[in-house]
Regions:
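Charge-patterned, long linear interaction tracts outside catalytic cores
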Residues: 176-202
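Catalytic-loop motifs flanking and including active-site residues across diverse enzymes
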Residues: 90, 156, 160, 182, ...
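Helix-centered, glycine/charged polyanion-binding patches within enzymatic domains
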Residues: 8-19, 111-177
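Polybasic low-complexity intrinsically disordered regions
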Residues: 1-124, 134
């Protein structure tokens, strides 16, 4: 299979006609419904390796669970994808799913979600996006003090992930196939939800 020639940089020459830039998945998700966007995402079991920001190799095998969690550590929307899929690719459909289920104001996300379409969709839904800036090798303006205080609430998402792995069986998944893996993880999510509700009312 021949690879397409790379897109030329800079201004086009006089009379030169260039193909329009290919629409990215995030740009496409802006006009799609949550169901349409999720249908495009890969859900196969895959294997891969990459270098992280510190230069160390990270490997993965299997699937990745994405969750939208409220400030009480209750999961509102959950989706399973291939492990190699970048977190930002699931942000927009999860925001749309959650907005259909509950009313909320702030979208708190880490630097992996620092992308223009995500900001745009968040504002279109009537939310306030507070997303940590991805420096991409450049200096960034720090968050305003009031945003930094609100951003601390994002720790509940990390707490949810930690509890799901350590207390509710997501660390060791001993089944194969996307349906069985999803069922295994969703039992853990339901149990965590019930446990958290009991903690809140007691």
């Amino acid at each position: 299979v021949e690879k397409p020639s790379p897109r030329k940089k800079g201004r086009p020459r006089r009379g030169e006609v260039r193909k329009p830039k290919t629409e990215s998945r995030l740009e496409r998700q802006c006009r799609q419904s949550a169901a349409e966007a999720l249908a495009e995402l890969p859900v196969c079991c895959d294997v891969g390796t990459k270098k992280n920001s510190q230069g160390y190799k990270e490997s993965w095998r299997g699937y990745k669970l994405h969750a939208d969690v409220n400030d009480c550590c209750l999961p509102i929307s959950v989706e399973l994808t291939a492990a190699s899929l970048h977190d930002s690719q699931v942000a927009i459909p999860l925001m749309k799913m959650t907005s259909e289920r509950v009313d909320y104001l702030y979208d708190l996300m880490d630097a992996a979600y620092d992308a223009k379409p995500i900001y745009e969709v968040s504002r279109t839904l009537g939310h306030v996006p507070i997303i940590d800036k991805n420096s991409r090798g450049k200096d960034v303006i720090p968050m305003a003090p009031h945003e930094a205080v609100r951003y601390r609430e994002r720790s509940v998402a990390e707490r949810f992930n930690s509890r799901l792995k350590e207390e509710f069986g997501a660390r060791n998944v001993m089944v194969r196939g996307v349906k069985k893996v999803r069922l295994h993880l969703m039992f853990g999510v339901i149990a965590l939800f019930a446990d958290q509700v009991l903690k809140l009312i007691s």
